[in-house]
């Protein structure tokens, strides 16, 4: 498959192949990471999209039901009666009781919640507000009734008005959650918000904010994603921008220190921060937040899954175990790397070990397989050349043995050479592509494929090595004199 970027970040107009191992080299601040951010945003935005949509819709319904408190204001009186276990006048209205008791907050199924809302509407329509008014008025327990005057009719009219407003809101809720059955708008907005999070709201070139920007991911005759961008937002012209996704999950690894903050936490439904609403960008997680959540999940592969994945997975695990043989333990007492009888706090683990740790943990919980896109930004940064070689071999083997798609950036000549060497050793040249970022006019950059001219990459590295070598030699000469 190929991804085409036009006026995204500082990338002018480039196409990159993603058919196994894709390596991007170039100077600092040359847009190497841009394509990774885009690919992550596209794949993550639509991963498990049906489940995400149901979850969002459940959350939306829950918030609307909470808002009914301010509409059905006088129903607070009946909630008090229910708590005091007095005569429940809603005994024959189970859906109203479902709302009054707050039981809807424990509802996990969108289908069940929708059925309950329908029943709630029906019961409100049947509800005799005159009877309620008489009941409330005669009990003389509701202090605010006195403010309505002495007429029961005033109370009945108020209850009737509140009931009609509630019915109207609930009917709108039903319409809203049944809109967009193909999730065309949902996918567009999810992609839009994920791009905005990953690019900090600067998807388009800062120097040319009014230019036309495009993203397209395709493969031969299939277009997976195609979207235009204006004013740092995905254009909404009613056209679907997402057709299907070639990857089930995606991980973007650019910070080994996230292991220090993985933690052991319990999450409860309904714990989303106050003020968040349907399609709120605050509910779109950054790639690091998502990765931490996956790593702390501590799920394990079943025996069946291990058997299906077979020898290839075991070989990957053996390779990593030669570098990092221990296991990981996350608990309320702390997070540890455990090797034999020794327990080392993960925060004290060598930085280079943390990059291997992340890959090992993802493999162990079954999150790296043939449906995975793995994006790594300068993974060699904290690795000794010996471990750079080992890491490069593992990356190549993930592509060869598990058919993982990997996109990585580097500016290390040793790591680049290691990837080049292992790519040839394990015969995956046809699944490997090398790119270099080249500066063009007006501060823009383009990706250039250098598969047929690998010397260009090494020449770039060698230039700066030669410069400091000559500088060093000049001072050695001065010292000898």
Task: Name each model feature, range by range.
Residues 45-371, 448-481:
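Phosphate-coordinating catalytic segments in nucleotide- and nucleic-acid-processing enzymes
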Residues 1-49, 335-469, 476-477:
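Switch/communication elements of ASCE P-loop NTPase nucleotide-binding domains
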């Amino acid at each position: 498959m190929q991804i085409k970027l036009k006026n995204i970040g500082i990338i002018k107009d480039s196409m990159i192949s993603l058919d196994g191992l894709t390596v991007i080299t170039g100077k600092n601040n040359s847009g190497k990471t841009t394509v990774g951010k885009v690919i992550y945003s596209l794949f993550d935005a639509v991963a498990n999209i049906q489940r995400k949509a149901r979850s969002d819709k459940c959350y939306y319904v829950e918030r609307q039901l909470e808002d009914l408190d301010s509409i059905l204001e006088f129903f607070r009186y009946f909630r008090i009666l229910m708590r005091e276990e007095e005569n429940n006048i809603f005994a024959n209205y189970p859906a109203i009781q479902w709302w009054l008791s707050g039981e809807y907050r424990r509802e996990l199924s969108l289908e069940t919640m929708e059925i309950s809302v329908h029943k709630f509407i029906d019961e409100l329509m049947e509800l005799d507000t005159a009877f309620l008014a008489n009941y409330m008025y005669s009990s003389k327990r509701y202090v605010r009734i006195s403010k309505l005057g002495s007429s029961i009719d005033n109370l009945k009219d108020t209850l009737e008005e509140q009931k009609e407003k509630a019915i109207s809101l609930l009917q709108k809720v039903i319409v809203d959650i049944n809109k967009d059955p193909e999730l065309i708008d949902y996918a567009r907005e999810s992609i839009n918000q994920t791009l905005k999070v990953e690019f900090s709201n600067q998807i388009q070139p800062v120097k040319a904010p009014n230019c036309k920007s495009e993203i397209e991911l395709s493969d031969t005759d299939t277009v997976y994603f195609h979207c235009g961008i204006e004013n740092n937002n995905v254009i909404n012209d009613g056209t679907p921008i997402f057709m299907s996704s070639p990857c089930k999950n995606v991980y973007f690894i650019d910070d080994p220190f996230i292991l220090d903050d993985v933690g052991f936490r319990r999450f409860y439904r309904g714990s989303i921060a106050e003020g968040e609403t349907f399609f709120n960008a605050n509910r779109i997680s950054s790639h690091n937040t998502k990765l931490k959540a996956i790593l702390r999940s501590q799920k394990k592969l079943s025996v069946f899954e291990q058997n299906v994945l077979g020898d290839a997975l075991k070989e990957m695990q053996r390779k990593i175990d030669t570098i990092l043989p221990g296991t990981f333990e996350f608990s309320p007492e702390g997070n540890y790397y455990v090797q034999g009888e020794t327990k080392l706090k993960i925060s004290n683990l060598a930085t280079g070990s943390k990059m291997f740790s992340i890959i090992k943990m993802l493999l162990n919980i079954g999150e790296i397989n043939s449906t995975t896109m793995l994006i790594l930004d300068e993974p060699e940064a904290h690795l000794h050349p010996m471990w750079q070689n080992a890491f490069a071999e593992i990356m190549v083997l993930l592509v060869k043995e598990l058919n993982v798609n990997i996109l990585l950036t580097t500016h290390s000549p040793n790591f680049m050479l290691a990837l080049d060497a292992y790519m040839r050793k394990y015969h995956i040249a046809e699944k490997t592509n090398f790119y270099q970022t080249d500066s063009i006019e007006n501060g823009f950059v383009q990706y250039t494929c250098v598969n047929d001219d690998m010397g260009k990459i090494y020449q770039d590295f060698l230039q700066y090595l030669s410069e400091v070598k000559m500088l060093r030699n000049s001072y050695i000469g001065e010292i000898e004199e």
